[in-house]
């Protein structure tokens, strides 16, 4: 994991943000190694967490001066920092699973010494199936092999 991603995770943890790691990095955490151009951070979309997210991304150095913290509480919000292949995507919605349900099943892991919560294997598969993109369906095929 690159230094910017590590710094972002540290900022999120320091601010006490309620988040779950999803997307390509979550896929990689289950042993299905594939290239990814971003770090997908799924946040709880509520006003209290939005303030924490705002503080974390500001500390990270993201351009938030034109934003209001409550924008991070909007369901369906996407906030991108940087450009691929080193982009951070902060999102408040994914397909196929609700945050409330996913949060109860999220798996605690450590990445480069940083504690993170990763979307559960079952929820990751549900999300990938719901998205329907070719690369996600390829992930599903491999991830389903880890169910056994």
What kind of feature is each model-predicted range?
Residues 1-148:
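Compositionally biased terminal segments of proteins
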């Amino acid at each position: 994991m690159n230094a910017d991603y590590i710094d972002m995770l540290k900022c999120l943890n320091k601010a006490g943000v309620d988040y779950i790691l999803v997307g390509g990095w979550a896929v990689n955490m289950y042993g299905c190694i594939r290239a990814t151009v971003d770090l997908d951070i799924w946040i709880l979309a509520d006003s209290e967490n939005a303030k924490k997210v705002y503080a974390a991304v500001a500390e990270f150095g993201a351009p938030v001066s034109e934003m209001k913290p409550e924008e991070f509480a909007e369901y369906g919000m996407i906030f991108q920092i940087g450009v691929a292949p080193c982009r951070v995507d902060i999102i408040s919605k994914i397909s196929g699973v609700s945050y409330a349900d996913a949060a109860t099943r999220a798996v605690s892991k450590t990445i480069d010494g940083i504690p993170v919560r990763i979307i559960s294997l079952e929820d990751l598969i549900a999300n990938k199936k719901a998205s329907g993109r070719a690369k996600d369906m390829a992930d599903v095929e491999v991830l389903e092999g880890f169910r056994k």
